[in-house]
């Protein structure tokens, strides 16, 4: 993403890699310092896909320096909450956006959407 190679690693559900910035054990974390997404190896099916899309949202925010925008527009005490809200929005509604675009544009959506999204965030 934006020239950064991200890695995805599956780890034990009790791994220290799954402890987030607030000290909470979660099912996945993203470490921008190492460009790594850590996923619990107990995840599967639709929940795995949902969590992965959420974590890819964190990758996008870090890769395109969008966290700086959050930090500029939101009080510091809300930075983490806003970042999580954005990634939840992507995970919860991103698929719907692509599905609707595909229904409207057909196969052209597969060519047009990635280009337009890249243009919007670069």
Region spans (language model):
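Metalloprotease/metallohydrolase-associated module, dominated by Zn2+-dependent proteases
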Residues: 1-47, 63-122
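Active-site recognition of the HExxH zinc-binding catalytic motif
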Residues: 50-62
